[in-house]
């Protein structure tokens, strides 16, 4: 079996968090295949308000975190089984994107207005995990996508800050398999992401359906044809992509990423 690996490339434009997340609209994730079969998972993190103290974080095996809970307190402790590295904002615990020693990568993406977490409950103290700590939690405990799904079934994910948007997540393993997690009306919904693209709102299944609006787009140049007694030809290469959206809304970025990658 051909050996596959995941390299996570993270391109940072600016960073913000918490209340500043209301100004953040542009995260785009793509997936590329190398000639040797390796999978490259890449993304942008484009936040408008400030850099908000973005930093690289290296977390060794056996490191212990405390889960944040609403109101500024701390909840359960969790200890990393695997070492991992990534990019965090504001403080080390709030990792936005990372990869562990097993090659599993995880990242969160802004997901306003369409997600809804379950309500925080003290009764779930031992299984509560805040949304902005889920990347760290998963990277420290899981090696495969199936393990991610099993681990998430054992926890309760709640909002870290009521002023912040909900988020959704992308998880990718060395085999190339990738999933998206969204929490809709308090329920975890998983999607197999064979396309390898993720942006923001609306939901992932809507973004896939929206690609049907661009079924006419093809690589290359449109062939000449006649219209009545006129002979028509394109102005140049790329004309078969005429109609590709050029704005920076999440649906348009999703379409561009899907066709360009």
Question: Can you describe what each PLM-predicted range is?
Answer:
Residues 50-51, 109, 116-117, 179-182, ...:
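Short helix/loop capping segments that flank catalytic or ligand/cofactor-binding pockets
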Residues 25-40, 48, 53-54, 67, ...:
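C-terminus-biased signal that marks the final domain/tail of proteins
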Residues 1-10:
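Bacterial N-terminal signal peptides that target proteins for export
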Residues 33, 124-158, 247-261:
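Alpha/propeptide regions of enzymes that mature by internal proteolysis
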Residues 15-24:
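C-terminal segment of classical bacterial N-terminal signal peptides
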């Amino acid at each position: 079996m051909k050996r596959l690996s995941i390299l996570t490339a993270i391109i940072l434009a600016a960073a913000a968090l918490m209340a500043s997340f209301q100004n953040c609209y542009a995260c785009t994730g793509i997936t590329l295949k190398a000639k040797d079969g390796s999978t490259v998972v890449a993304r942008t993190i484009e936040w408008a308000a400030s850099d908000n103290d973005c930093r690289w974080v290296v977390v060794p095996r056996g490191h212990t975190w405390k889960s944040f809970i609403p109101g500024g307190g701390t909840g359960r402790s969790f200890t990393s089984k695997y070492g991992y590295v990534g990019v965090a904002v504001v403080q080390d615990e709030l990792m936005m994107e990372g990869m562990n020693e097993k090659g599993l990568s995880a990242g969160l993406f802004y997901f306003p207005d369409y997600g809804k977490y379950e309500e925080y409950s003290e009764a779930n103290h031992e299984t509560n995990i805040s949304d902005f700590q889920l990347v760290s939690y998963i990277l420290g405990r899981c090696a495969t996508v199936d393990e991610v799904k099993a681990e998430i079934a054992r926890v309760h994910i709640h909002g870290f800050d009521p002023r912040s948007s909900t988020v959704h997540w992308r998880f990718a393993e060395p085999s190339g398999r990738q999933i998206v997690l969204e929490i809709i009306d308090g329920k975890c919904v998983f999607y197999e992401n064979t396309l390898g693209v993720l942006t923001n709102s609306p939901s992932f299944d809507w973004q896939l359906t929206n690609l049907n609006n661009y079924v006419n787009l093809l690589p290359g140049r449109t062939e000449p044809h006649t219209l009545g007694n006129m002979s028509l030809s394109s102005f140049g290469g790329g004309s078969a992509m005429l109609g590709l959206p050029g704005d920076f809304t999440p649906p348009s970025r999703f379409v561009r990423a899907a066709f360009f990658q």
